[in-house]
């Protein structure tokens, strides 16, 4: 239990120092969270310079908007939300966010049960291979934990479109899993 308290204390001290614009605290914050946040960026943008740019832009926003963090929730969660929003803005700017509203009605449980047999790296590759719209909604819903209403607002789409994109993503993942005989 001391480790958890210690980690929370360190995080709180980092936040306070970042609010004072302490460069060493900003560097420590970057080092502490950059790996996890790069994984978030890659989930939406793939590996490459765009993900790296979004990571850097996201951290710039973290440090310039740190005064808005109210310390009631998780600092990591707050940073993650900024990274997701930055990734979505980059996708919009690139003109890559296209959604179609069709429901295929795949059974959720079938796909999720199959995931349990895969290694994380294999699953990430399958998710990465999805079309951009499907991948984006799948990541927001299944990995980040947003609901369809929140996703619709974030992406500027109808709630039904979010649901159908998730259904299509799960359907494609199921097909890919079947090919792997999972």
Indicate residue ranges for each PLM-predicted region.
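DNA-recognition helix of helix-turn-helix
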Residues: 84, 88, 143, 155-179
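Structural recognition of an alpha-helix C-terminal capping motif at a helix-to-coil junction
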Residues: 39, 53-60, 73-85
């Amino acid at each position: 239990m001391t480790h958890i308290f210690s980690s929370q204390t360190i995080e709180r001290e980092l936040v306070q120092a970042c609010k004072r614009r302490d460069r060493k605290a900003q560097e420590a914050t970057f080092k502490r969270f950059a790996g996890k946040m790069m994984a978030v960026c890659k989930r939406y943008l793939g590996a490459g310079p765009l993900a790296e740019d979004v990571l850097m832009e996201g951290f710039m926003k973290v440090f310039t908007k740190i005064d808005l963090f109210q310390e009631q929730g998780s600092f990591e969660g707050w940073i993650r939300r900024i990274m997701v929003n930055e990734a979505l803005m980059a996708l919009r700017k690139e003109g890559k966010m296209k959604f179609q509203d069709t429901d295929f009605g795949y059974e959720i449980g079938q796909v999720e049960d199959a995931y349990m047999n895969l290694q994380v790296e294999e699953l990430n590759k399958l998710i990465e291979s999805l079309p951009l719209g499907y991948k984006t909604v799948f990541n927001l819903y299944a990995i980040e934990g947003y609901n369809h209403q929140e996703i619709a607002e974030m992406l500027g789409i109808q709630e039904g479109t979010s649901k159908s994109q998730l259904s299509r993503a799960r359907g494609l993942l199921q097909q890919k899993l079947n090919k792997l005989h999972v």
